[in-house]
């Protein structure tokens, strides 16, 4: 993604943008990254956040950012145009396999069972990355703080005999934007092998967007060099934000320069960047 020279005057004119100091990239080992941050957070409502997402921003709690790395365009914002989406045979099979899961949509809230699942997921999938040691406060700041129209979705098995709730399998946080749903974060039962819960969750979001009359599901960033991001390229068609324009993305032929570690470590220019 290229560095922006300007942002639309409205409705973003009240915001300020600044570049962070360099920090270790969380997606590509050995890389140095930085972000462009939108502030102040209390002015970022659902309408403004919709415009920011269209410009490649994401959020973590109330922290709204996009990649702003020197010499690197590895992070490509991607979205699925839901009316044109055509599931693959594997995706259709996955949808059928998990059709008995019961999805419950609610406002963001803390639940001890959710937090326990989150910790099991982090310990199994991201051990040693820091998030496997998240306290309850850190969990809440990361996933349960939002100033926009956000929802928590839990996926359970069918209720057990006697009315007991079915086993919790997955929890997903989503934002409802003016032009789509934005997938914030998903965690699931790590002991369930070969379930592709993450793929099922995106398929569910696509169906929800259709039912709400929303044209897109935003999937965050796709990174060609990151195996963890490979699944996003399996949704067709897929649009990517390239050089400031959303266009159909061909992951096999995308014209991006290779990630250059030397350039990624280049000295940062002084002062604010972007529009701030």
From Swiss-Prot:
Keyword check for DNA damage: no
Record localization: Cytoplasm
UniProt keywords, alphabetically: Acyltransferase, Cytoplasm, Transferase
Enzymatic reactions: N-terminal L-glutamyl-[protein] + L-leucyl-tRNA(Leu) = N-terminal L-leucyl-L-glutamyl-[protein] + tRNA(Leu) + H(+); N-terminal L-aspartyl-[protein] + L-leucyl-tRNA(Leu) = N-terminal L-leucyl-L-aspartyl-[protein] + tRNA(Leu) + H(+)
Catalytic activity, EC: 2.3.2.29
InterPro entries per record: Acyl_CoA_acyltransferase (IPR016181), Asp_Glu_LeuTrfase (IPR017138), N-end_Aminoacyl_Trfase (IPR030700), N-end_Aminoacyl_Trfase_C (IPR007472), N-end_Aminoacyl_Trfase_N (IPR007471)
Cellular component, GO annotation: cytoplasm
Annotated GO biological process: ubiquitin-dependent protein catabolic process via the N-end rule pathway
GO molecular function: arginyl-tRNA--protein transferase activity; leucyl-tRNA--protein transferase activity
Primary role: Functions in the N-end rule pathway of protein degradation where it conjugates Leu from its aminoacyl-tRNA to the N-termini of proteins containing an N-terminal aspartate or glutamate.
Family statement: Belongs to the R-transferase family. Bpt subfamily.
Protein name: Aspartate/glutamate leucyltransferase
Species this chain originates from: Burkholderia lata (strain ATCC 17760 / DSM 23089 / LMG 22485 / NCIMB 9086 / R18194 / 383)
Taxonomic lineage from the root: Bacteria, Pseudomonadati, Pseudomonadota, Betaproteobacteria, Burkholderiales
Gene: bpt
